Amino acid sequence: MQGAQIISIGSAVPDLCINNKEISQIVETSDEWIVTRTGIQERRVLTGTNKSVVDLAYSAAMKALDKIHMDPLEIDLIILATSSPNDLFGSASQVQAKIGAARAVAFDLTAACSGFVLAIVTATQFIQNGSYKNILIIGADVLSKWIDWSDRKTCILFGDGAGAAIIQACYEEDNAILGFQLNTDGKQYKKLSITYKENNYSLNTLKLFQGQFQYISMNGKEVYKFAVSKVPASIIKCLNALHLSIQDVNWLLLHQANKRILQAVANRLSVDNYKIISNLSKYGNTSAASIPLALDEAWQNNQIAKEDIIVISGFGAGLTWGTVVIKWKC
């Protein structure tokens, strides 16, 4: 069995930045209220005619490719983790065409805020079983298009962005995707969802119904309790399986959901604040993009060193949560 490792990463965010003061002009809130409860100071929002998640995914992917001077034709598989596709049938194929990866298979993966973790795990399986050599994974979301901007419980939280990574086959002894642990509790799906709702009247004599997707709905208190209880347990279970302790970990990278969640999880694990990778204050909750966006920024800032052990954990809608432990090789 061959190994797998991340060899490059890139990210992209929209140009438009909306700070808390501007949000307070839309709904009844304030910068102090938002920062105190979430840690978010500003977020990026995608605007413009015909702009979609594909544009952000393309930009992030090209940055990851350009950093290592890789030809897109070398990519065998593209996995786009998104919950806000440009096309309900999937947007990965559009990314494939846009970057010129004509030889790659492409598909979407929908797991909301856990999407990038599942993309890493899925790509690693394809590589370790010998199916593919070079896989491009992308976490990208434009949840601003699915927000009720009159609902202050949700509109203050989310931003748009994309992050991409290239995972490549390597010798088994050089494997850097060390282990993973995944979970789902579908009984709690209503706590964070974008549900489809049918009209309550039929359109014709055949009793056929049509409807539409609703805005983001979230029970914040329940999501907090879920994350703070489940995520530390997932991380410990994953580390134990690898015979690693929390002291062996150089960096903790959690889905950038909320400052209180990040701090509570770190406290439960007894992780020092200086080991937490976070850019939540600048971008808000970017769903599947949040982990690669923070990882790329940490790398660009020389925060991460080669051979560092990074614990990555995503959690959110589904409810789904999971952990992957990697060794940094870039």
Swiss-Prot record:
ACP-binding: annotated segments: 256-260
This protein's pathway: Lipid metabolism; fatty acid biosynthesis
GO annotation, cellular component aspect: chloroplast
Subcellular location: Plastid, Chloroplast
Enzyme Commission no: 2.3.1.180
GO terms (BP aspect): fatty acid biosynthetic process
UniProt entry tagged with the keyword Amino-acid biosynthesis: no
Primary location: plastid
Single Gene Ontology MF annotation: beta-ketoacyl-acyl-carrier-protein synthase III activity
Keyword field contains Membrane: no
Keywords: Acyltransferase, Chloroplast, Fatty acid biosynthesis, Fatty acid metabolism, Lipid biosynthesis, Lipid metabolism, Multifunctional enzyme, Plastid, Transferase
Reaction(s) catalysed by this chain's protein: malonyl-[ACP] + acetyl-CoA + H(+) = 3-oxobutanoyl-[ACP] + CO2 + CoA
Active site: C113, H255, N285
Pfam families: ACP_syn_III, ACP_syn_III_C
Swiss-Prot/TrEMBL domain comment: The last Arg residue of the ACP-binding site is essential for the weak association between ACP/AcpP and FabH.
Family, similarity comment: Belongs to the thiolase-like superfamily. FabH family.
Role description: Catalyzes the condensation reaction of fatty acid synthesis by the addition to an acyl acceptor of two carbons from malonyl-ACP. Catalyzes the first condensation reaction which initiates fatty acid synthesis and may therefore play a role in governing the total rate of fatty acid production. Possesses both acetoacetyl-ACP synthase and acetyl transacylase activities. Its substrate specificity determines the biosynthesis of branched-chain and/or straight-chain of fatty acids.
Protein name: Beta-ketoacyl-[acyl-carrier-protein] synthase III
Organism the protein comes from: Gracilaria tenuistipitata var. liui (Red alga)
